[in-house]
């Protein structure tokens, strides 16, 4: 599926392609004091004396760490805060248990945008040594959240419509385009709606892994973004074949993962005489997974394609990590029939945007909380161990346009 291209002298995109945002009004001392006083009053009314309340600012939400005078009363603090009317007075209220305190998250009166430029320019991303670094946004203390997709190794993104799922995908893709050369990374984009990923067809000559197709360059570019279940089934099946072929190459080279294989290949270039080649990472991005898996009554071929899509995704999630193949799924239908037990087992890293109910939140995260989010990129990021509340980085349509045009203009 991979296109061999000459990337000698390839230049990664620069930060000048991304917008600089004018800093917005920050959280005022008066707002902080008002919210601290409200928390203190609720606890005092429940006969819990507070030693300290420490605000940790975030771009959209602030975490207020509550330290009761008697540490034995932490559980009572949580109950009081959960049963209080804070959720009626303030937006985005979520109560969390911390190591040394109880935290209460409250939305700021005025949200700050998190520009993609600012997170890509942060030392945590620029100095990252991980294989597939992703700067997804900022959390409390305005710390940039960077994770390694190679270790994820797959990612489920879910939530109600227009809450930030597409923005998260754009942030992930931008992070990877700013850190990996075409020889190191390929994408597969599956877009049943046919509108979310069309801008990425400009990456065809450099970053897209596609099935061989007859036709003009225009026809090839048009088919580079997969738009229906039948084509998705074919591409995902081809990825499974690629995965098995890669396992054969690793076995022949006597290694057990893609990083070791590529290091050995660099040292022993003559391996190409035995069928060996440098293996780029492959990231399959699948938008609105539910649209690809809905069974269509009376259409056997469509039902077969639906089943094939699901089976291939599970296989890739189960075995793809070692050979550098990773899957990102999104859905706006977080029901148990879509996010099945098999999906959850094989996608331990999950992002939830605002959901319409506590049930939907639990379907995604095995925990409530996503129903409390305030939308517009406010997310809960679960890495399989702990949960972080993050404001997603924003990369606008015009910025994506500039990035893809820049890459399209590079030498093949």
Sequence positions of predicted segments:
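Surface-exposed, low-hydrophobicity interaction/linker segments
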Residues: 29, 33, 67-68, 347
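AAA+ P-loop ATPase mechanoenzymes
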Residues: 57, 78-89
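Generic alpha-helical secondary structure
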Residues: 25-36, 74-77, 81, 400
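P-loop NTPase catalytic phosphate-binding loop
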Residues: 1, 6-13, 50, 63-65, ...
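Short, charged/polar, Gly/Pro-enriched secondary-structure boundary elements
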Residues: 72, 109-116
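Short, conserved phosphate-binding/catalytic loop or strand-edge motifs used
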Residues: 58-62
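Conserved RecA-like ASCE ATPase "motif II neighborhood" in helicase/translocase motors
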Residues: 265-271
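Charged, low-hydrophobicity low-complexity segments
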Residues: 1-52, 274-276, 406-412
